[in-house]
Amino acid sequence: MESGFSGGGGGSDFYGGGGGRSIPGGPGTVINVGNNNPQTTYRNQIPGIFFDQIGNRVAGGNGFSGKRTLADFQAAQQHQQQQQQQPFYSQAALNAFLSRSVKPRNYQNFQSPSPMIDLTSVNDMSLFGGSGSSQRYGLPVPRSQTQQQQSDYGLFGGIRMGIGSGINNYPTLTGVPCIEPVQNRVHESENMLNSLRELEKQLLDDDDESGGDDDVSVITNSNSDWIQNLVTPNPNPNPVLSFSPSSSSSSSSPSTASTTTSVCSRQTVMEIATAIAEGKTEIATEILARVSQTPNLERNSEEKLVDFMVAALRSRIASPVTELYGKEHLISTQLLYELSPCFKLGFEAANLAILDAADNNDGGMMIPHVIDFDIGEGGQYVNLLRTLSTRRNGKSQSQNSPVVKITAVANNVYGCLVDDGGEERLKAVGDLLSQLGDRLGISVSFNVVTSLRLGDLNRESLGCDPDETLAVNLAFKLYRVPDESVCTENPRDELLRRVKGLKPRVVTLVEQEMNSNTAPFLGRVSESCACYGALLESVESTVPSTNSDRAKVEEGIGRKLVNAVACEGIDRIERCEVFGKWRMRMSMAGFELMPLSEKIAESMKSRGNRVHPGFTVKEDNGGVCFGWMGRALTVASAWR
């Protein structure tokens, strides 16, 4: 077929014509054709006359006759494509393997200094529908140029022709027209790219924590990129997570955590307690190892509370301590009763209830015979004698001097005597009260009963007259007596029944408002934090730090807390109850609540406000509650 040009042409020499030239394919259309002679160059094409020849070509034109058959051409194309893909996948796999330890940094508008294969050309198909080859035949094409080139291509009958601005940027295979892939094959190329990226993420354990759908990945980055990241690490790496209880979130602290932290909070305490309650001793021990207890005299009440709680939890894991019977603890307990208004006002409320039960006649005031099961250092009765003296001074001095008779029962727990100084100490207390009574013009009769077992408790064993008026004081006594949760004998209820058999006119009960007896371990920890935390804060706010007794009181509170949290069974002495449970227990023993008079409540309120505005006094179901900042710490009540 004549082409109209010198030098031969036409369809017969499409693959092997003598020289590269433009062949007219129709009105106003040309197709670029090269031959197999590398020395022959393309002729300069006339701008503005490029048209689509395929649209005007007659279908079924198979009259080409070349040096190679179609099958040979397709086989050559497939072989060349395999050779191009093999180094690409080898390079991609190498990049993925070498990038496992360091995740490359992604930069916007990054241009790789070392070229790589453009993935969009891997799956391109030729005009002949075979296992197609790339239009660029494996040459490196920057992504920006590829996108610009694709935007310049036109679509004709579903086939994109290689005409436009990017057609001559790179040499093409001689003898083959530069034809772009079919349009629907572009989606397959994108799918393959996405698949490779997913494979990359799986190999690198990439969870997209850097955020965003970043197109610049390990595959599209060059070797020099991740090598640069190895040489120059990220100046702001992810900091090590610091230890925190609350929390198990993935947020990190601004500074690197050390192996031991001096910061501990109530939340940390609850985390340790939860681990212990769930039997995860190793986890609890690990957390405790991170918490330091650096002695600091300037620590506030909250920090001291946490220190006590940590010591209690450590003791819970190791060997519990039982040091509540020592002389040091007895002294600290008495100091607590004297320095803390919540305890001191509770004793005073009990004294007022005892004085209200006295008989008034022409011969003078007849104070009931007081039976005390835990007199301590006698501080409560020092205040009782002074209050009685104040009342007496307000009346006619013609009356006879009042007589106060007190019987102190040696301290016993679970039916056994406790070595707290015994009879000698109690006699010393009696001597002190007698001397004070003499100065105040009050006659004091003080008796001591020792070696008395619970089953032998009666009027006769106490030295009481059959028709004598009695008052039994149980202030801060019952919480230390075991109940049915400790032993089947239930000494707590047995003591109440024995006291009921004495037929007293009044029974005074003062106890801490705290649920630490039968509460589960976690409940005890939470309750101890709330109760003893408020108590420590009240001591800190009312007792000057220069007072040497303050440290002793705080240490005593710490021992009480440790016993309540760390010990179980008979070793746990601190078994406080809330007022509601005491009401039920007293009612079951046959007692009836005697609401404290409004006069007593108002007197306690005025005294509490004079000490510190943070102390609160309120009536609650017949009892008077004393607390700190709204938290009830002690409750006083009277029974008959």
UniProtKB/Swiss-Prot annotation:
List compositional bias (Low complexity) regions by residue number: 242-262
Q: Where is this motif: VHIID?
A: 368-372
The record's region (VHIID) falls at: 333-408
Share an example GO biological-process annotation for this protein: regulation of DNA-templated transcription
**PANTHER family xrefs:** OSJNBA0084A10.13 PROTEIN-RELATED
- Residue ranges with Gly residues bias: 1-28
Domain spans labelled GRAS:
256-640
Q: Where is this region: SAW?
A: 566-640
Which residue stretches belong to region Leucine repeat II (LRII)? 428-460
Could you identify this protein by its name?
A: Scarecrow-like protein 8
Tell me the keywords, alphabetical order: Nucleus, Transcription, Transcription regulation
Which Pfam families does UniProt cross-reference here? GRAS
Cellular component aspect of the GO annotation:
cytoplasm; nucleus
Q: Where does it reside?
A: Nucleus
Species name: Arabidopsis thaliana (Mouse-ear cress)
Q: Name one GO molecular function term.
A: DNA-binding transcription factor activity
- Please give the residue ranges the record annotates as the region Leucine repeat I (LRI): 263-317
Q: Which family does it belong to?
A: Belongs to the GRAS family.
Renumbered to this chain, region (PFYRE) spans 470-563
Segments traversing the membrane:
none
For the region Disordered, give the residue spans. 1-39, 227-263
**Known tissue expression:** Expressed in seedlings, roots, leaves and siliques.
Q: What does this protein do?
A: Probable transcription factor involved in plant development.
